[in-house]
A protein has these predicted regions:
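Soluble ligand-binding/transfer domains with enclosed cavities or grooves
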Residues: 2-147, 151-157, 168
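C-terminal structured interaction module
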Residues: 153-180
Length: 180
């Protein structure tokens, strides 16, 4: 069995994650999952432009989410089909962190596991290849928890002076797993 990107970064802390979170991050190959999601719109015109640049939802929605994963030992591609928007990102390892490529942005996350919760802490960001200064770096809440066969997620990103750029929360039902 190949160790997932998240297992590699977390090491022994991986065992502290809720079983549903562990199961989700051990999925390999091409799989699809279904669940429910709610998205919030960006706070300002500038925040909407930035949301467009990083391909995150720009309209408030509530409804089904269809999630497609293509995971190998070196890279994971996540495609989130929201009710009115599709968002794709690619995750790889970078110096002991997870690097997520999302449109014109590269996000560098440290991972933390505590009491079943996975927290992704943004440590660095590059926009169009240019490093973002710490004072301008977004405040990001990115958490996953598990409840039975559901992976719950909560993502919220705000940029100083622009306000909320992206926000969505919901769950994926692990019993809906389909091999693609």
């Amino acid at each position: 069995m190949t160790t997932s990107l998240y297992e590699t970064v977390l090491g022994t802390q991986y065992a502290q994650l809720a079983p549903a979170v562990q199961s989700f991050h051990r999925m390999a190959g091409r799989v699809r999952l279904h669940g429910e999601v709610e998205t919030e719109p960006p706070d300002s015109r500038a925040a909407r432009w930035l949301a467009w640049c990083i391909r995150t939802p720009r309209m408030p929605t509530q409804g089904p989410i269809h999630f497609a994963l293509h995971a190998t030992a070196r890279e994971e591609t996540w495609t989130r089909h929201f009710p009115r928007h599709t968002m794709r990102s690619t995750l790889t390892l970078h110096r002991g962190r997870i690097m997520e490529r999302l449109g014109a942005v590269h996000l560098f996350f440290a991972l933390e596991a505590q009491d079943g919760l996975l927290r992704m802490r943004l440590e660095a960001l590059r926009f169009l290849g240019i490093p973002c200064p710490a004072w301008l770096r977004p405040t990001v809440l990115a958490e996953e928890t598990g409840n039975g066969e559901r992976l719950h997620f909560h993502v919220r990103a705000s940029v100083p002076l622009l306000g909320l750029v992206a926000a969505y929360r919901g769950y994926l039902d692990l019993t809906t797993l389909e091999l693609a």
